[in-house]
């Protein structure tokens, strides 16, 4: 038997893939457009308060006279419960009930009225370990268009689960003009934000979406976020401190705009209204350069 080891064959050069191809992605329909509405996609580390932020921001837009639609993109389907006061059925649940014959559905089967006129939809998601979130988001937008529900909408907010930015749950970026990142002033949150920045920058090569900025949440200070922003080219759009009143609003199944008047909650309401006005006025498209993982370790920390 020969003892000569054969040199392994050179790896095959894989053909380049278009966006949406591959085993973990869904081919996006380039013709599936939302229309004239201002569309924002909200990302951030899991548990950082994206749904709270999205719901309060939706109400702030509605307080400024805008017709708002919030779309929850999470299998937990709890994005809109402070607006609707309940966990509403998901689009996938409703489609399954009619064996995916969408023509049998009415708008009231999957769109639910929320506080101050905000329209609420929970896209839901496939069972754990199966399917792809991109399909769910695509079906949701398709349904909304079929029923002409996007034609009378001024603002759409996609509230996207955790910091998962695979081809599936990055699907809202196909529709958004601006992506917003909710982050706290801590290492784990900023580490996740860096990954999200990288994913959004990759998607921006094929889609209109650009980063709009950071919403600092549940934080007394912003020094670590400020340090990261300066290093990559981001900016902070709003700062919501860690308020007990905001936590209590979730327990009461309501937004901060429905809570009893308290000085700290009034400041939070004004910050949400200011953020909504800023986004409506238009934010500069940002093109940050994400850091390598090891560089974040070197950058962050107390001096």
From Swiss-Prot:
Catalytic activity of the protein: chlorophyllide a + oxidized 2[4Fe-4S]-[ferredoxin] + 2 ADP + 2 phosphate = protochlorophyllide a + reduced 2[4Fe-4S]-[ferredoxin] + 2 ATP + 2 H2O
UniProt binding sites for [4Fe-4S] cluster: 132, 166
GO molecular function: 4 iron, 4 sulfur cluster binding; ATP binding; metal ion binding; oxidoreductase activity, acting on iron-sulfur proteins as donors; oxidoreductase activity, acting on the CH-CH group of donors, iron-sulfur protein as acceptor
EC number: 1.3.7.7
Keywords: 4Fe-4S, ATP-binding, Bacteriochlorophyll biosynthesis, Chlorophyll biosynthesis, Iron, Iron-sulfur, Magnesium, Metal-binding, Nucleotide-binding, Oxidoreductase, Photosynthesis
Residues annotated as binding Mg(2+): 51
Residues the entry annotates as binding ATP: 47-52, 76, 217-218, 241-243
Superkingdom of origin: Bacteria
InterPro entries: NifH/chlL_CS (IPR030655), NifH/frxC (IPR000392), P-loop_NTPase (IPR027417), Protochlorophyllide_ATP-bd (IPR005971)
Region feature (Disordered): 1-24
GO biological process, one term: light-independent bacteriochlorophyll biosynthetic process
Cofactor notes: Binds 1 [4Fe-4S] cluster per dimer.
Family matches, as Pfam families: Fer4_NifH (PF00142)
Enzyme class, spelled out: oxidoreductase
Cofactor(s) demanded: [4Fe-4S] cluster
Summary of subunit composition and partner proteins: Homodimer. Protochlorophyllide reductase is composed of three subunits; BchL, BchN and BchB.
UniProt protein name: Light-independent protochlorophyllide reductase iron-sulfur ATP-binding protein
